[in-house]
A protein has these predicted regions:
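Conserved glycine-rich Rossmann-like NAD(P)H-binding loop of the short-chain dehydrogenase/reductase
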Residues: 35-46
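NAD(P)H-binding glycine-rich loop region in Rossmannoid oxidoreductase-like domains
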Residues: 45-49, 53-102
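A conserved pocket-lining segment of Rossmann-fold NAD(P)-dependent short-chain dehydrogenase/reductase
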Residues: 194-225
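Conserved Rossmann-fold NAD(P)-dependent oxidoreductase catalytic core, especially the SDR/UDP-sugar
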Residues: 75-77, 88, 95-150
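Glycine/proline-rich active-site loop of Rossmann-fold NAD(P)-dependent oxidoreductases
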Residues: 165, 179-195, 225, 234-245
């Protein structure tokens, strides 16, 4: 059994990318477990019991200055920077991790946990699912694909630093993370909530944007809270380190089952796959003024549609023409028993988005009777 619920004793966590979809969940979990938490972002984090550090991961000088007096024992790296090509992704994202670990050469680091994803098995965006793919569900021991991939470059940086600096490591391969974050580059949960809210506002159907394969195939996802638990487990459980692990919720579903249930939550007419994909980048084109008007009338916290939607990412995810799901046996056999029901991950996120005024609340909640 995993024991990451045990209180921290003199442990200090450095969460890199602390305002993102995975990092924010880690910050919350670690603070709840009694860790001293250092949250490293460019914008800062305001949370009780958490000390924010502002630094630029692209600048060794900025990192050296920001971390000069810090002594983290555990590092959780969840940051990445999207570039135009995979060559640039490799150059930039490998450097982000390398710069951070170099800046910690003086620190008593015991473990570094790195978040990546299932593009480890699928390939990067520009060569996505090209060539022969491993069979599903994906297993951690699959060999690397013969293509350039910034996940591979980050692993190589991690392993070299572990050998040089003497810490243990873990890699966490997540699939489509569901969680709370604003301005995140890959945020399907918030994106679908915004799509459904706009459809509700305009009395339009809630149209599935993806492929026939995704509509009918089995798939899975990763709750950000579960990802945080998994990274903490691997960082602290005896004999769990120095391994790469898949991390998904533990259930599987088909979008043809899930989509009507998401539509029912928002009270919109859910429409499934019909003939061809209908991408969100097309469906939601020109909706910036609609969203700004909704934000003004409903008192929403973010009027900028680009800050609460990532149409391109959701289109790419739901437009895949292959089945995508991951095996969790390795984590289970090592002692991690965490689980989430994906429908609950969605609805709990939607509840929080409403409470935080990121999407409109139902009229009844606002004190206005619903029309009959």
């Amino acid at each position: 059994m995993h024991n990451s619920s045990a209180p921290a004793h003199g442990r200090t966590a450095l969460v890199v990318g602390a305002s993102g979809i995975a990092g924010s969940a880690l910050v919350t979990l670690l603070a709840e477990r009694g860790w001293e938490v250092l949250a490293l972002t460019r914008s800062g984090v305001s949370q009780p019991g958490v000390r924010s550090i502002s630094a630029d991961l692209t600048s060794p000088e900025s990192l050296a200055a920001a971390l000069a007096g810090e002594n983290p024992t555990h590092v959780f790296f969840t940051a990445w920077s999207r570039q135009d090509t995979e060559r640039e992704n490799i150059e930039v994202n490998a450097a982000l991790l390398r710069n951070l670990l170099n800046a910690l050469h003086h620190s008593p680091v015991e473990h570094v946990a790195l978040m990546t994803g299932l593009k480890h098995y699928l390939g990067p965006f520009e060569a996505y699912a090209a060539g022969e793919m491993p069979d599903t569900p994906f297993h951690e021991e699959e060999p690397r694909l013969p293509v350039a991939n910034f996940y591979y470059a980050q692993e190589d940086v991690l392993w070299a630093a572990a050998e040089r600096q003497g810490f243990s490591w873990s890699v966490h391969r997540a699939h489509t993370v569901i969680g709370h974050a604003v301005g995140n580059a890959m945020n399907m949960g918030l994106t679908l909530a915004v799509q459904a809210s706009i459809c509700k506002e305009l009395n339009r159907p809630f149209v599935f944007p993806g492929s026939e394969t995704q509509w009918n195939s089995l798939t899975d996802m990763t709750d950000s809270g579960l990802l945080a638990e998994h990274m903490l487990w691997a960082a602290t459980a005896e004999a769990a380190g120095d391994q790469a692990y898949n991390i998904v919720n533990g259930d599987v579903f088909r979008w043809r089952w899930m989509w009507p249930r998401l539509g029912a939550y928002f009270g919109v007419d859910a429409v499934g796959f019909e003939n061809e994909p209908r991408p969100l980048e097309v469906q939601m084109r020109g909706m910036e003024t609609v969203w700004a008007d909704m934000a003004a009338r409903h008192g929403l916290a973010e009027p900028d549609l680009a800050r609460v939607s990532s149409w391109w990412h959701t289109d790419g995810d739901l437009g895949r023409n292959i089945e995508v799901l991951a095996d969790m046996s390795k984590s289970r056999l090592a002692g991690f028993t965490g689980y989430r029901r994906t429908l609950d991950s969605f609805t709990q996120l939607f509840d929080r988005l409403r409470a935080d005024r990121l999407i409109p609340r139902p009229l009844a909640v606002l004190g206005v009777p619903k029309a009959t």
